[in-house]
């Protein structure tokens, strides 16, 4: 079967007009059942904010390695601060042995301090660990907070749309995201100065384990690819659009009616793209640490799998 990534304008849903909400929900349901990815417009996030984050992000990653290394997390808080080039590999999450990914990253977590609410759960501490913010370039820390808030609002709206698309009350997910531990990550894919190792990608093949992911991307070709029917197809959103994909949690919520799809970031094959660098910023939506991830009542059918 030949798939394409559906392009969906969610503005008609956000305006609140019943017909528009129904149309958007139907489009989202179709995309969620077939490919699990959406090219999203009408999201309301200013392009100027995204471009500012890209610009400042490039400046941050241009800093000397020893300065960036000062932001590396100490202890178990793995989703905070700076992580250097080829120090992490996402293919390991699916049990694949491959070289580490050709990217460096800056991770940023919840702004609101919810750690006390989950102090009784030993493993929750890392989910609500303090952020490690850069002080260079000037204002980058403020931009990160502003963009996190914008993604946070969009994710809440998307969950409203997803609820309607899954034939649930619009506010079904809302109580589950009041103390979320969503992660925002800025990934820098530098120009390749030498050939990659065999099997080494910019980001190895994986699925996202949260509820949903929002991605802003820019830079050279040879980027995001989505797997369907054993093949891979590129995702190249137009300027101003975002990419949204479902995570494993949403697949469980919907009893596997909706799909969390394998994806990767390829290493460019042609010299021009390989010598160009790119940056992406992803927001990985995770509900409250104690949220129950169980089959939605509308998706049980002949029985819940989860």
What kind of feature is each model-predicted range?
Residues 1-306:
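Peripheral, non-catalytic segments flanking oxidoreductase cores
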């Amino acid at each position: 079967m030949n798939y394409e990534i559906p392009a969906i304008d969610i503005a008609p849903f956000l305006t609140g007009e019943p017909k528009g909400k129904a149309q958007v929900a139907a489009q989202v349901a179709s995309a969620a059942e077939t490919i699990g990815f959406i090219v999203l417009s009408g999201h309301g996030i200013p392009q100027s904010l995204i471009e500012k984050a890209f610009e400042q992000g490039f400046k941050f990653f241009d800093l000397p390695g020893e300065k960036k290394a000062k932001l590396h997390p100490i202890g178990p808080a793995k989703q905070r601060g700076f992580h250097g080039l080829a120090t992490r590999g996402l293919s390991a999450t699916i049990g694949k042995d491959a070289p580490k990914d050709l990217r460096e990253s800056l991770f940023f977590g919840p702004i609101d301090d919810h750690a006390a609410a989950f102090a009784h759960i030993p493993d929750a501490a890392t989910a609500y660990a303090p952020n490690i913010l850069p002080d260079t370039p000037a204002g980058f820390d403020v931009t990160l907070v502003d963009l996190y808030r914008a993604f946070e609002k969009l994710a809440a709206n998307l969950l409203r749309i997803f609820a309607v698309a899954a034939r649930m009350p619009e506010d079904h997910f809302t109580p589950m995201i009041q103390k979320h531990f969503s992660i925002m990550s800025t990934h820098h894919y530098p120009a390749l100065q030498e050939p990659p190792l065999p099997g080494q990608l910019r980001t190895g093949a994986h699925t996202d384990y949260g509820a949903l992911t929002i991605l802003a991307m820019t830079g050279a070709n040879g980027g995001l690819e989505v797997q369907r029917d054993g093949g891979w197809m590129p995702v190249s959103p137009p300027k101003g659009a975002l990419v949204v994909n479902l995570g494993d949690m949403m697949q469980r919520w919907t009893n596997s009616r909706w799909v969390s799809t394998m994806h990767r970031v390829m290493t460019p094959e042609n010299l021009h793209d390989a010598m160009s660098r790119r940056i992406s910023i992803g927001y990985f939506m995770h509900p409250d640490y104690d949220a129950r991830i169980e089959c939605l009542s509308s998706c049980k059918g002949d029985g819940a799998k989860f």
